[in-house]
Every structure is written in structure tokens, then in C-alpha cells.
Amino acid sequence: GQIDFQAPDEGTGTDAILKSASIQAVSEGDFSSSFNRTSLVLNTARSAAVGSAGDGGKLTLRSNGSMLLKDMRTDANAPSFILQTGNTNVAQDDVLGAIEFQAPDEGTGTDAILVAANISAISEGDFSSSSNATSLVFKTGASETATTKMKLSSGGNLSLPTDSVELAFGNDSDVKLTHVADTGLILAAGGQTTSDFGTP
């Protein structure tokens, strides 16, 4: 089935009276006694009838829960997904937007249903006419609601706030740089310590 949106009586005519948007339920294959997979497709138009090649945008929600966002224009444009806050007075540590990852229906419950990972944009201070300083914060959880493990500041500084954090390099992680709380850094290769950068 399909729902179309149109302004057929628009006085300016031409593009203005064409179908400008649609919602479609589209089969993902031949229906059978064991198959009725269907995608929900939202189409928008810019200067042609909705669904025309090379025009408008398309959002598809598939039966497996995946989502596809496509800019249908052919002139090298790329689609964007924008998270906006309605906050009119952004202060320090306000979350401007976040993406969370969770398995809320996991049968074992407890920790299993908590937010397992999170990517947030968090303000570094009060916004003003000359400042919108924001950090991108990456959170993960092991047996907890996800907590901050890495932060990229507005100035480009990368911080890893967890003690004993380890950076691994190479396909086999054969070179590792490990932080030791209140001590310094240890550089190891092939399981052997090669350098120890202690605090002064």
C-alpha cells in the first residue's frame, strides 16, 4: 500500500502540483505461508514528482530493523542525520545529542538490559555568540550502564580517563602502550617491556 501527499490545487502549477511525498509498504520478496517481510519507505521530493530518479530523499526501514537513508540526487550530495536540542540556554555538561546501544529484551535481565554503549555530544561550557565548544564522548559498559572511556575535546585533545587503559597497535596487537595509575606509561612489544615512561 501507499499514501501520497500532494497539493493539486496550488496555483503556481508545474512542480508545485506534483506528488511531493509518499509512504510505502514494499515487499522484500515473494509472500508465502512463511514470508511476509516488508519495508516501510518514506520518499520526499525537491523539484520533481516523488520517487523520480535523481530527486529528493529516501528513508527505508527494513524488516530486520536496519535503516537506510539516501540522498537521491546524483550531483555528489551526501545524506546527513542531524540531532538537535531545543535547549535555549545551553550550559556546561548539557547533552546536545546522543546515540545509545542497548538490548532491553535480553532475558537474563539486570546488567544485560542496561545501556551498553553510548556516543554523546556534550557542551564544555555555556554557549554564547562566540562559543559552542563541545566534546564527543564515547561510553562503554562491562557490567554497568555505559560510562565514559574516551573523550575528544573541541580543541582536538583525546583523553582516556580510565586507569590502566591500554592502546594496542598492529593486526596482532603486538605493540601495546599501557597506562599505570600515578606511575606513567609502559611500552611493550611481543609481550616484552621495551620502554617505561615514569612520572618525574
Write out the residue ranges for each language-model feature:
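Short Gly/Ser/Thr-biased coil->beta-strand turn/linker motifs
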Residues: 1-9, 16-25, 36-45, 51-105, ...
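Outer-membrane beta-barrel proteins
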Residues: 28-31, 124-125
